Amino acid sequence: MKLNKLFDSKTVVFKKSDKYGKSDCCKTKCVEGQIEFGVKIPTDFPAFNRALVTFLKTQKNQLNVDLDSFVELYKAENLCYKTALKVVVASITFCETTPFTMKTEPQKNVEVAVKCDSEHTSLIKEYEVVGNYVNMARQLQDTPSDQLYPEEFVKRFEKAATGLGVKITVLKQADLIKKKMGLLLGVNKGSEREARLLVISYNNNKKSSETLALVGKGITYDSGGMNIKTGDYMRGMKYDMSGAAIVCSTVLALAKNKVKTNVVAVAALTENLPGPHAQRPDDIQTAYNGKTVEIDNTDAEGRLVLADAISYAAKDLKATQIIDVATLTGLMSYILSTTYTGIFSTCDMAWDAFKKAACCAGEPVWRLPMHPDYLKPLESKLADLQNSTSVKGAGSSRAACFLAEFREGVPLIHCDIASTASIQDLGQGVLVRTLYERAAQQAKE
């Protein structure tokens, strides 16, 4: 994206129009190089983002966008324009980057130059960086699992982190064994490739004692293990590492923009495959925090690797708040579809702060319930817990309650991105913007 160096091509301006009816007042119309709004300018930012992305993707070659005209619409009605401006910049960077492809003739994306006042330049530059790391997460999400496995995932981020002032720690198989991370190691038993725990630390606020831990599920391919997925259910399981890509990309965005905050990403990385040594239903594994877990279903593996990573963030990294991101339960597609990401929180104050961050980022989230009753079906006669149950109902809430057993008293927010991580077979980099805003807010608390 170019700033104030316009192409010799048409310029898109934003304007408000009164020729649409009330039913169209929140819709975005694209007419002859102009982006027109109905009676009201957009406050439903997710819908606006979708409309703008759709418009930009239809454009060819080069395009100028007049952001000053956009800001003026909000100022004229005494509305805060910053979130709206962030959404526009996010939409532009989203469309400028080609998703992962191995086509011999990949689609050429539109190049965008923006016209903007100098007072908005810093915000635009900041959010262009965020958009670039959203795109990094998208690229990793779309990469086939034979090219992106735990060791390669680590290498990609080690390279991307060069010069950003972050500290990278990698726990390899021997380290995980020494640490007794039995849940992560149990999931890994069927794979020929070793597991990894990737830690990316960014500490840039010495005045604060707060550390935000972002924990990501990094199953680089999920076959279901011995409870193998059938039919079409194995398609798209390369996206089971989306949480790890998202949290790691977020920390790099914060570091690139030198945000005054303390944040650490923890990515639990492994494949979940069947094999002669794979864990089986009825096995009992010991978690990093010492709790024992009976395996009821090997396809409920995400909560296992997250449990060890969450305990590690609390015990070893001394996190004061933990947010985990995971493609955890397929039920989310029935509950919230691809519109909202489901959020579970052990703390109302933590939820309030997270919701504020999501609003600032323009990403739709919805809080779902946690209750001790949901945990009862996960009681085991032989271990402290079991990882799943045949009892119907509230499966997503039950998974969240399972994770809460490993937080060591630290406030936990669980983000289930099972239905929003990828849409129409393309990674979305969902929640990078929200997590970025949350970490940036923490610096001001």
Swiss-Prot record:
What protein family does this chain belong to?
Belongs to the peptidase M17 family.
Sorted alphabetically, the Gene Ontology BP terms of this entry are:
proteolysis
Q: What is this protein called?
A: Probable cytosol aminopeptidase
Q: What does the note accompanying the cofactor annotation read?
A: Binds 2 manganese ions per subunit.
NCBIfam families, per database record: PRK00913.3-2 (NF002080)
Q: Which positions in this protein are listed as binding Mn(2+) 2?
A: K217, D222, D240, E301
Major location category of this protein: cytoplasm
Q: Where are the transmembrane segments?
A: none
Is Transcription regulation there in the keyword field?
Answer: no
Please explain the role this protein plays, according to its UniProt record. Presumably involved in the processing and regular turnover of intracellular proteins. Catalyzes the removal of unsubstituted N-terminal amino acids from various peptides.
Provide the protein's localization. Answer: Cytoplasm
Cite the active-site annotation: K229, R303
Q: Which gene encodes it?
A: pepA
Q: Report the EC code(s) recorded for this entry.
A: 3.4.11.1, 3.4.11.10
What Pfam families does the entry give?
Answer: Peptidase_M17
CDD domains named in the record: Peptidase_M17
Please provide the record's keywords in A-Z order. Answer: Aminopeptidase, Cytoplasm, Hydrolase, Manganese, Metal-binding, Protease
Reaction catalysed by this chain? Answer: Release of an N-terminal amino acid, Xaa-|-Yaa-, in which Xaa is preferably Leu, but may be other amino acids including Pro although not Arg or Lys, and Yaa may be Pro. Amino acid amides and methyl esters are also readily hydrolyzed, but rates on arylamides are exceedingly low; Release of an N-terminal amino acid, preferentially leucine, but not glutamic or aspartic acids
Task: Give the GO molecular function terms.
Answer: manganese ion binding; metalloaminopeptidase activity
- Residues recorded as binding Mn(2+) 1, renumbered to this chain, are D222, D299, E301
- Cofactor(s) required, per the database record: Mn(2+)
Q: Name one GO cellular component term.
A: cytoplasm
Q: Which domain of life is it from?
A: Bacteria
> Record's PROSITE patterns?
CYTOSOL_AP (PS00631)
Question: Which InterPro entries does this chain map to?
Answer: Leucine_aapep/pepB, Peptidase_M17_C, Peptidase_M17_leu_NH2_pept
